[in-house]
Amino acid sequence: SNYGASLHKKSMRGWMWHGGSPKEDIEDNLRVLRERSRDAYMGVPLATGAIKTMRTNVVCGGLTPTPQIDNAFLGISDEEAQKINEQIAREFALWANKPTCDADRIDNFYMLQQLAFTGFLLNGDSWAVLQNKKTPGVPYDLRVRIIEADRICSPAFMDILSPTDINEHHVEKIVQGVETDADGMVIAYWVCDRHPLASTSVTGLTASHWTRVEAYGKKTGRQNVLCLMQRERAGQLRGVPLLAPVLESLKPVSYTHLR
């Protein structure tokens, strides 16, 4: 072959390749990729600028609703529809503009979007758990909890590739915290109750420290967990950090101050 499969061209002879499934090529290497990606973000200005510029250009002020109800279908006038649209926007702002929409009670909804997108770029995927919590003086109970990708991981850090029981749950397969059924459909996520890389998590984490969260509520059918990820291969369950392909090139840049 005269193309990429050539075994005789001088430029290709030294290419040591190895193929695998998405698990071998991606999921099994994610911990190293995430940690190196975050390290580059914190210590290499080129990486920092790339991530922040993309976040600003994509998220900007954040997604905002633009209600446009179908007044013809509802049988109401344009003026009535406009009043309802304005009321919907006001009610959404009542929830979104305050940090009470954040389960951590720090960011408003638009700042949460920036946080989630930054995590997606740095870690390959970003996660949000939708919770309900009554708070005095707050009319809406919905809370958004952003979870860093590291906390979505397999119990005791061991992927399950054959049927077994964990914490009184029968599971078919768990890869990097994503549980699938016998047909390969995602049905649940396993969340560690603390960050696995925290100083208090170095030892002593057993399967009991993980909580199984169903992807969809049994009664409501509502999504319990939102995952921001871009798949690149069929069968892929976790995302790849944006900086992964250029980490090797960024490494020498971090030493430029020594020259």
Predicted features, each with a name:
Residues 115-197:
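Extended, Lys/Arg-enriched charged tracts that mediate electrostatic binding to polyanionic substrates
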Residues 241-248:
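Alpha-helical multipass membrane-protein architecture
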